[in-house]
A protein has these predicted regions:
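Glycine/proline-rich, positively charged
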Residues: 1-2, 12, 16, 58-154, ...
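Conserved, mostly hydrophobic/aromatic
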Residues: 22, 35, 48, 76, ...
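Short hydrophobic/aromatic-enriched beta-strand-loop microsegments
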Residues: 45-48, 137-145, 244-251
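Alpha-helix-loop-beta-strand connector modules within alpha/beta enzyme cores
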Residues: 33-51, 105-114
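Acidic (Asp/Glu)-rich catalytic clusters
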Residues: 36-47, 77-81, 132-135, 161
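N-terminal binding-site loop/beta-alpha segment at the start of enzyme catalytic domains
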Residues: 1-46
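Structured C-terminal cap/extension of enzyme domains
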Residues: 12-15, 19-23, 134, 154-261
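A cross-family glycoside hydrolase active-site/sugar-binding cleft signature
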Residues: 23-25, 49-51, 88-91, 120-122, ...
Length: 261
């Protein structure tokens, strides 16, 4: 498992790099506990985002019920030693759950009680569109990367029209661009054309950099999150994120490669 020393080294490195946004979740139990042990009186140096409502392992209760969400938020506050969470996302509940209203209402109640500063939804496709259409969330967290551009046509434009923040998850395509991974693991038939194009453009030397730059090139993306407990990987990804933007020509070519629905 990950040690407190690793987390301290990682979060110290993030601050040195000017990175202050931390994403975690109630169901990532150990993550929140280690973050809390690190933070102490330094919580003001970070923007802490977590996710609620998804039950890890199940406890006989209905996910996304008001009681589950309330307890989820309270656990996150306690683990991280915080009085207020900067941003809390509903954790990948369906459009049907969103329409029922109980989950969103529970999150808004926590905001009104001063436990949450900003509210959000984490999910993709029709579920994300439902969340945006409700007009109650401050941000969404969606999958968007060089191998999965499904958010490009509807979700990102809808978020832009709504004026809400967008956090991109899986911005380096779960590192599936690196050997020994291949199309059957991620990206399907889109994998080979992307690899061929990036090779032709001389961008295959560091496919992770190209993928991260692709994600960050979209003007609606507020932030991109990459899971790691390794300070060296964090520094490498920070360097990738600060590289030159992809050319409009390459971006257009990558957009045109995406599969038709």
């Amino acid at each position: 498992g990950v040690s407190l020393d690793q987390i301290e080294n990682l979060l110290d490195s993030l601050l040195d790099l000017g990175i202050t946004f931390i994403d975690t979740a109630d169901c990532y139990t150990r993550s929140e506990e280690l973050i809390g042990r690190y933070l102490g009186d330094r919580s003001g140096e970070f923007v802490i985002a977590t996710k609620c409502g998804c039950i890890s392992g199940g406890d006989g209760e209905e996910e996304y019920s008001r009681a589950v969400i309330e307890r989820s938020i309270d656990r996150s506050l306690k683990r991280m030693g915080l009085e207020c969470l900067d941003l809390v996302f509903l954790h990948t509940c369906s459009a049907e759950v969103l329409r029922a209203g109980e989950a969103a209402d529970a999150l808004m109640r926590a905001r009104d009680a001063g436990k949450v500063r900003y509210t959000g939804y984490s999910g993709d496709d029709a579920d994300a569109l439902q969340a945006i259409s409700m007009g109650v969330f401050d941000a969404i967290q969606v999958t968007f990367n060089i191998l999965n551009q499904t958010a490009l046509d509807e979700v990102l434009p809808a978020a832009q029209c709504a004026g809400i923040g967008v956090v991109a998850k899986r911005p380096i395509a779960n590192a599936r661009l690196l050997p020994p991974d291949s199309p059957q693991f991620y990206g399907g038939p889109y994998w080979d054309p992307v690899r061929s194009l990036l090779t032709d453009e001389g961008a295959w030397d560091d496919p992770l950099e190209c993928s991260l730059r692709f994600t960050l090139s979209h003007p609606v993306i507020t932030s991109a999150i990459i899971g790691t407990a390794n300070a060296l990987h964090a520094r490498e990804n920070a360097k990738r994120a600060r590289a030159e933007a992809l050319s409009p020509k390459l971006l257009d070519a990558l957009h045109k490669l995406r599969p038709e629905d």
